[in-house]
Amino acid sequence: MEVNKLNSLVELFFEKLNKIDKEKPFLKWLKPNKSTYTWRQVSERIFKLSNKIKSIIKEGDRCLILSENRPYWLMTDIAIMNAGGISVPIFTTYSSNDYKYILNDCKPTIIIVSNNDQFKKIKNFLNPETKEIISFEEIDHKSLLIDKNF
């Protein structure tokens, strides 16, 4: 594999995927239970999420990721790029004003959060451009009651 002939991280991932034993470990998460993800598992999750994203966005649309560092973060980033979106990663430690500014500035078509705690940080700053909110973990339905005073 000649890395200098590849144009993106997505190409690099799929080039490697086509050449490697898909049952080999790709990611290992030390928390909470030292989970290991094989190349097959990771690629299946990337394809599934990428297809979902493609069904919602146009090429070049922004997709915001608000998550702690975890395996799904990497899978999400690759899925967004594979779908033709632009990843907008934001830290979980920003202030409310930071979240408000970023959401207003980037106007993401999709927001992907890791869990209910992260969703609560941004729910009051959603805008009409956001068509879908995806979460790695289940979100409390009460959290979805959003006051959209635009």
Positions of predicted regions on the chain:
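ANL superfamily adenylate-forming
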Residues: 31, 35, 120-150
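Conserved ATP-dependent adenylate/AMP-binding module captured primarily in the ANL superfamily
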Residues: 92-125
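Nucleotide 5′-phosphate-binding alpha/beta core
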Residues: 41, 101-105, 110, 137-150
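Short beta-strand elements of ligand-binding domains
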Residues: 67, 90-91, 114, 131-141
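N-lobe entry segment of adenylate-forming
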Residues: 1-61, 78
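Conserved residues at the C-terminal ends of beta-strands
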Residues: 28-30, 109, 114, 136
